[in-house]
Amino acid sequence: DEPVCMKYGASEAYALTAGGWIPTVEMTSAPAGWTADFDIARRSLLIAPPAEYTDGMDLENTVTIQSDDKPILSQEYYVLDFTHPEGTFVLIEGNMTSENGTIVYFDQHMRYHEKVYEEINDNEIGNVLQDMYLANGKIYFITQNGKTSSMGTTFNGDGRFVVCDAHTMKRLVARDMPFYANIDTSTGATQSSKSTLCWPQHIVVVSPEKAYIQYSTADNESHSGIRIVDLQTNIIRTSDIPGTFGVFTKTGATKARMVFSRGKVFAGRGNSVIVLDPATDAVIKTVTYENRQVKDLAKGYDGKIYAIFTGEFTGNSGMTGAASFTKPAMIVALDANGEVVSETNLPEQIELRTGTASPTVQMCASFTQPHLYFIGKQDFSAYEAMRYNYETGRVNWDYI
């Protein structure tokens, strides 16, 4: 039979029947930490994982019942645990005007589970789900709008900053966490007063006590930056990490995932990759390419950090990104210290978006092969992704 999937705190009861005389019956194996109650008199079997994860418990095992040293019943069971190394999350943003975001989960047996957060917590995460991060036995979620959409519609969301137990998905923290930036277009931008609401967009957790959140401002994303969140109090700082705040897609933090690797955080900023030291919360290195935009970063299977830059371009990219390219797009590889180890031009057919409406190209990397995946077209509505081999330079067009 196929393995039986069970949720933490659930139970399955079975009525047992025998097709003939069985002289002796005994249970010879059961998952460690689970309840496995075999009642011969009542001819019943009850299987239940614990309500919470406990150290040393089996996530999956086999219940075996035998007679005269011969198995007469054997069934595999597993608990739906969201930390399994072979599980995969798919984050669905939702729509800012009509519905909240959600997540789906493919478990280690490639079974598809919908609305795992909603079923466990009896509510939705929030409006415009942006990012999630697993660390310290927890899952951290970021939503852009929280309980209220940018159109003012109230949804049944838990907030803009939500923390769950990584094993069970049970909600631990739910905060709407509004924060603001002061935008003065005549003199530049500071972060001293409550003037413009900020939209949290990406998170990286650097320790059990601290995380960084990248955000952009709610005035059509004119500015962006990175701030510190205290994970003990779940309060976000009122000022930015120096060197991360500026004009969106030009001098401010890129609306893209940050990478935490070997004690450092790698992030995009305008035309640069910046390296932050969580010990000092300071930018300790900047790698800049003039007249380009950094679009995304990802950590390759070889341990290097890969950044993808647009080609060199002229003109104001504006919201839709009508740029004229003079040099091709480029992949830059950096080592653990942020030193450039290679610069590789991409084929000239690859023209990456430059407008503020398309700040990233959704790049990710394979954990096991030298492949990067990203959108290589300027079309705002493009839905194809290509695969790039950073060892051979080979491109598989429209791979996804």
Question: Where do the protein language model's features map onto the residues?
Answer:
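Short, solvent-exposed loop/linker segments at beta-strand-coil boundaries, enriched for Pro/Gly
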Residues: 22-37
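Post-signal peptide N-terminal segment of secreted/secretory-pathway proteins
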Residues: 40, 46-55, 94-199
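C-terminal edge beta-strand
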Residues: 72-82
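Structural motif
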Residues: 97-104, 149-162, 220-228, 271-277, ...
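Short loop/turn segments that connect beta-strands within beta-propeller blades
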Residues: 107-110, 165-169, 230-234, 277-281, ...
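A short beta-strand motif characteristic of beta-propeller blades
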Residues: 111-124, 170-193, 234-248, 282-288, ...
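Repeated scaffold domains used in trafficking and secretory/extracellular systems
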Residues: 124-133, 181-204, 243-262, 291-302, ...
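Loop/turn-rich, solvent-exposed surfaces of beta-rich toroidal or solenoidal domains
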Residues: 354-400
